[in-house]
Every structure is written in C-alpha cells, then in structure tokens.
Regions:
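Multi-pass membrane glycosyltransferase architecture that uses lipid-linked
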Residues: 1-224, 270-416
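Luminal/periplasmic active-site loops of membrane-embedded glycosylation enzymes
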Residues: 38-51, 222-274, 373
C-alpha cells in the first residue's frame, strides 16, 4: 500500500476518532474524579506514589497519571487533561497501524476498521453510556499507553529490530505489567539476545533506581494485587452469578480492592483454579507457539487472550490490550467478529451495572455471554497454534524444531 494512501487513511481515521471522542472530553468519570485526580495532586505536591498514595501500578505509570496535574490541578482540569492525553495515545495507535503494519491496503484498512469499531463500542460513544463512567472507557483508563508500546514492539520484532522491540516492550512493562508475559512470544527465533537483554533491562533498572532515589518502595503495589479475590466480571465468577440467577443461595457481592468481588462458598478455590488453568494454558501456548508458524501478532494475541480470559480480575479495559493486536493479526476474520461481539456485550453489561449489587439478570446474563464469547475467541486464536505445534513436534519433524524466522510481513521464512 503506497505511503500516501497509508497517510490518507491515518488522517481520515484520526479525524473520525476526533469527531467521536472530542465531544466527550470532560465527561464525569468515577476513577478520574475519586482516584487518579487526588493521587496526582498529592504526588505533585510531594507525596510518594507507593508509600503515601498506594499506587497499584509500575513506576512508569506515575508520570502518565500525574502529567495532567501539571497543566491544571483542579479536578475538572485533571479530567480534561487526562482524557486529552489518552486521546493522543489512541491517535498514535491509529498512525502506527496505518503507517507501519506490513501488507496490502486491505489488511491495513481492516485493522483500522476493527480497532475503531471495537474502541467506539467499548467506550459507549455511540451506544448508551456505562453506569460506571459517563466518559469513554478508553479515555478514562490508561491501558492504551502500554498497548501502544506492545503494538510497536510486535511491529519492530517483525522487522528484526532486536533492541527496539525489547525496549518498547520493557517500557510497556514499566507502565502496566502485562507486557512482561509477551516476551516469550517475541523471543521466538531471536538471534541477538544480548541486545534484547540490555535494551529490556534499561527501562526497568531506571524505574527501580528512581523508586530508590525517591525513598519509596514498590512492595505495596505487589501486595495489592496478590490480595485481590475473584472479581465479579471474571470467568470464574460467572458460574456463581448464573447459579444465583437460577435460584442458588449464598452468593453475593462486596466492594474490595477498587471493585466488586464475589462472596460465595468456593469463590477462593475458583479464583485459584482460574490462575492454575490460565498458567497452564499460557505455558502450553508458549511451548506450541515456539514450534508453530504463527505470526508474531497471532502468538501475542493468543497469549493476551489466555491472560485476559482466565484472570481472576477481568476489568473491561483489559479488552483494550487485545483489540489493536487482534485487529492487526486477523483483520475481518471470524476471530475479530467474536471479539467485537464480546466487546458489545461488555458494553451492554456496563449499561446495567446497577444490577451488580443484587446480581440481577440484566447484569449477569450479558456478562455471562461476554465471557463465553471470550472463551470462544481464545479457542479460535489458540487452536491453530496448538495444532501446528503438535505437528512440528511429531517424531517425523523432530529435526525441524528450530522456531521459524519471521519476515517483515510476519510470514515464516527459512533462517538466513
């Protein structure tokens, strides 16, 4: 696809996003008003992020969170600034897909289309708004920031830029930890491990040094996540919620760790089961992926899917991790049809969030459908990788275990 057409596509899609999202700038958001704005103002005024404000995210998230407060530290000013900041990252993702995704025009346009439809649907810009936030979900959270770095890392890996992809992925880890679990996918076939290690270590060591120099400590963020129990929107919780709607007793919700959690006999065991199954699925996909001919985008999408689907905490914004990667991997394929349906039912569930206290059917059923769709999506993206891995690992193919080298278009080629 000629560069001028790529640039034209980027401009047009950016204009569409601006037209849809700019009118929402400043809309009320519970997390921005009640959490991020007070935390940002306190840190700007000298308090420590972890010791004093109990920030739950890695160190490089702090500049992202507090930057708007330096322009206007009023609550409304912070909300406006934060949403503009996230809109800038949204536009950066569009530009990156339009200009850097290899392939013909159809691949680029379909990726941009899937990303746009998914983002608009999940953000409630066209559909009814969420009952949690009036503002768009994509602009009320900062998940687009690490997602941009993940997207850049995969594109750099396709171009065999060892230091670049590792550095970008490490920056994502330093903002929100989930990109750490994508290293195995991008290490497949990598020949310059020294550059990967050095480039990946620099952002993390810089963050650690900054925390130490400030006299702060990061342990509270780790403790926060290890103490979280089964969240109402997780796959494991859906079993209890559906049972409650069908008449089972002893199932309720409670507020804890920034959200609603399931209280029921067996909920703790279900949470641990989700972790165990998710870990097993993750390592299985890594093993199969190293033996398969899946592209980097496909393997990263599969690993993200297993992380999201089996997480004991499955917040709606986690789907933003998947969306642009899956859009680039599968375009208008059935995988993304299922993912977009899952996003649609996520938004429907958010429109009925007033049913979370009583676990009413209007909340539980859309959520259950969403989780089934996410399971279906995981099956669609993981099954080809597992099948391919098994074939390559068969006795007749044991001489061909070397992972494929991926060309710039993400197509397996012979090692050079």
């Amino acid at each position: 696809m000629p560069t001028r057409w790529r640039a034209t596509a980027a401009v047009l899609v950016c204009a569409l996003h601006l037209a849809l999202f700019v009118p929402t700038i400043g809309d009320w958001s519970s997390i921005l008003v009640n959490d991020f704005a007070p935390q940002a103002k306190a840190i700007k005024d000298g308090e420590l992020p972890y010791r004093d404000q109990r920030i739950e995210y890695p160190p490089l998230s702090v500049p992202v969170l507090i930057a708007p407060a330096y322009f206007d530290d009023s609550t409304q000013g912070f909300v406006d600034g934060f949403m503009w900041e996230m809109l800038a990252f949204d536009l950066a993702i569009i530009v990156l897909i339009a200009l850097a995704l290899p392939g013909e025009g159809g691949r680029v346009l379909s990726a941009l289309g899937v990303y746009t439809v998914g983002l608009v649907t999940l953000s409630g810009v066209v559909l009814d708004r969420s009952l949690i936030d009036y503002g768009p979900l994509a602009l009320d959270r900062f998940d687009l920031v690490p997602t941009l770095f993940v997207l850049g890392a995969v594109l750099a890996r396709d171009r065999e830029r060892s230091a670049t992809w590792s550095g970008l992925l490490s920056l994502g880890v330093a903002i929100k930890a989930f990109p750490l679990f994508l290293y195995p996918a991008l290490l497949r076939g990598e020949r310059n491990l020294r550059r990967v290690i050095v480039a990946g270590a620099i952002p993390l060591l810089a963050c650690a040094a900054a925390v130490i120099v400030m006299g702060d400590e990061f342990g509270s963020a780790i403790t926060y996540h290890t103490e979280r129990t089964l969240q109402v929107e997780s796959l494991g919780a859906s079993v209890f919620e559906v049972a409650h709607v069908l008449g089972a007793s002893g199932v309720s919700t409670g507020v804890g760790h920034g959200g609603f959690e399931i209280s029921a006999s067996g909920a703790t065991a279900a949470g641990w089961l989700s972790v165990v199954v998710g870990a097993a699925g993750y390592f299985w996909l890594v093993w199969a992926g190293w033996r398969s001919k899946a592209t980097n985008f496909e393997l990263v999408a599969a690993l993200l899917a297993v992380l999201v689907v089996f997480a004991p905490v499955l917040s709606p914004q986690f789907l933003l991790w998947l969306l642009p990667v899956s859009a680039c991997a599968y375009g208008l394929g059935r995988q993304n049809i299922v993912l977009l349906l899952a996003i649609l039912f996520t938004q429907i569930e958010l429109q009925h969030y007033d049913g979370v206290d009583a676990l009413s059917g209007s909340f539980v059923w859309p959520l259950a459908v969403r989780n089934v769709l996410l399971l279906g999506y995981l099956a669609l993206v993981a099954a080809p990788i597992v099948r391919d891995g098994r074939k390559t690992a068969s006795p007749s193919d044991r001489g061909h275990r070397r992972p494929p080298n991926l060309s710039r278009g993400g197509v397996a080629t012979a090692p050079r």
